[in-house]
Amino acid sequence: MLRRMRIPAEPKVIIRHCDAYDPARIRTLVREGLEELGLRPHGRTLIKPNLVAAGPLFPHAYTRPEFMEGVVRALQDRATDSLREIAVGE
């Protein structure tokens, strides 16, 4: 059965400040945002990060692994029992 994401009547943007790339802190902030929006991942879920930064590991822009860890763990925290897969598309 295909379930589509519920689109809110009034779109909402949540912006949070995070001082460091701490996966635990990122997890908390993202989980709180998901809760505020009433979103619960289910089925096969794809995330496509657009947050990038340059650093010593790669001189060009890339998405930090600590950020992705926090986001994926927050999605797992909020997931329904029907969540089968979380995929990352870059």
Where are these regions (language model features)?
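N-terminal and secondary-structure boundary signal
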Residues: M1-E90
